[in-house]
Amino acid sequence: MMKVLVVVALLVTLISYSSSEGIDDLEADELLSLMANEQTRKECIPKHHECTSNKHGCCRGNFFKYKCQCTTVVTQDGEQTERCFCGTPPHRKAAELVVGFGKKIFG
């Protein structure tokens, strides 16, 4: 039963990864068309770095492209500002955990 569960988890992860690649390709096409208007091309933004000014510029992680995650921050003056950082969404963290676990088991 455990082997079946691991195999199903791996299949779900692989399907998620392949669909993510297709989505990332579409995002890349949109990003390239936007960047064509800019004179200089910026490098991608690493994990845990700020992406407030460039929400589509996050780097690619081990399996998935990082996503720009935003939150509203209230300063000491009571002013609300939006702060964003590149990170891995929870469902993708779970997929990476399953793949890592599968690699440890199957070599």
Swiss-Prot record:
Proregion span(s): 21-41
Compartment list: Secreted
Signal peptide: 1-20
Keywords of the record: Disulfide bond, Knottin, Secreted, Signal, Toxin
Keyword Secreted in record: yes
GO molecular function, one term: toxin activity
One GO CC term on file: extracellular region
Cysteine pairings via disulfide bonds: C44-C59, C51-C68, C58-C86, C70-C84
Principal localisation: secreted
Swiss-Prot/TrEMBL domain comment: The presence of a 'disulfide through disulfide knot' structurally defines this protein as a knottin.
Protein name: U1-lycotoxin-Ls1p
Organism: Lycosa singoriensis
